[in-house]
Swiss-Prot record:
Regions annotated as coiled coil: none
Predominant location: cytoplasm
InterPro entries in alphabetical order: dsRBD_dom (IPR014720), RNase_III (IPR011907), RNase_III_dom (IPR000999), RNase_III_sf (IPR036389)
Cofactor: Mg(2+)
tRNA processing keyword on record: yes
Binding-site positions, Mg(2+): E55, D128, E131
Disulphides: none
Subunit note: Homodimer.
Signal peptide (residue range): none
Record-stated family: Belongs to the ribonuclease III family.
Name under which the protein is recorded: Ribonuclease 3
Protein's UniProt keywords contain Translocase: no
Length: 248
């Protein structure tokens, strides 16, 4: 427990330095420790808390703040249009990208097993952390500080022209489509790996299989890029066979 206390002290010092960049001066250490504690870390260290409760609160706060922002910023858009915008802003892939850009991964408290499986790269965990930290800020410093922080981070990022074209998460879209009414298993398989090309880069070819049937194929210089392109290809093909609307 002494190690955890020392680690938490150093972590809080680093967090204070991070938030100071945004003119945010955090106070209550425990809120932020809880917001950063994954259940795998809590299990290993016999802690009574994880970030899940904070994530629950942060999710609600974020939905409210983004709804208010969109309502005030786009008076000419109808309910359906602003709902669609909100879903794009608060979706997992968008929040995860923001956390990557802010370099919050080193602050995460993960168990050894989760570290081994690169939990600090998983979209779900990164998105959860943004929401849980929003809750910590709300409990520590209040609504006005949270609103300003969201505007200076999330809103600023998504306001860049063409942002959503760059960040679109086709893998998540495909998974959500299947979960909505298709019980078949989705798998990504590496079928080809090129010899090192210019700059020692390797080109990977991945296929997306649904229920053992190949639906999509993609090539990229990383596994992640190839999987995203395979998912995009699969979504386009599914759009021709179902009522799914593929938004290009």
């Amino acid at each position: 427990m002494q190690f955890i206390n020392k680690q938490s002290e150093q972590l809080f010092i680093e967090l204070k330095a991070f938030f100071k960049q945004y003119h945010v001066f955090i106070k209550e250490r425990q809120y932020y420790l809880e917001a950063l504690t994954h259940n795998s870390y809590a299990n290993e260290h016999n802690l009574s808390y994880t970030y899940q409760r904070m994530e629950f609160l942060g999710d609600a706060i974020l939905a409210k703040e983004i709804s208010l922002y969109l309502f005030l910023s786009f008076p000419d858009k109808n309910e359906g249009e602003i709902t669609n915008l909100r879903s794009k802003i608060v979706r997992e892939g968008t929040l995860a990208e923001l956390v990557r850009r802010m370099n919050w991964a080193p602050f995460l408290l993960l168990g050894k097993g989760e570290i081994k499986t690169k939990g600090y790269e998983k979209n779900r965990i990164l998105a959860d952390i943004y929401e849980s930290m929003i809750a910590a800020l709300y409990l520590d410093l209040g609504e006005d500080v949270v609103r300003t922080f969201i505007n200076n981070t999330l809103i600023r990022m998504v306001s860049n022209p063409g942002f959503f074209d760059k960040i679109r998460d086709y893998k998540t879209e495909l998974q959500e489509f299947l979960q909505a009414g298709d019980a078949r298993t989705l798998e990504y398989k590496l079928i080809k790996e090129s010899q090192p090309l210019e700059g020692n880069r390797v080109l990977y070819t991945v296929v997306a299989e649904i229920g053992g049937i190949r639906y999509g194929e993609g090539c990229g210089y990383t596994h992640k890029e190839a999987e995203q392109l395979a998912a995009r290809d699969a979504l386009q093909k599914l759009a021709t066979k179902s009522k799914y609307h593929f938004e290009k």
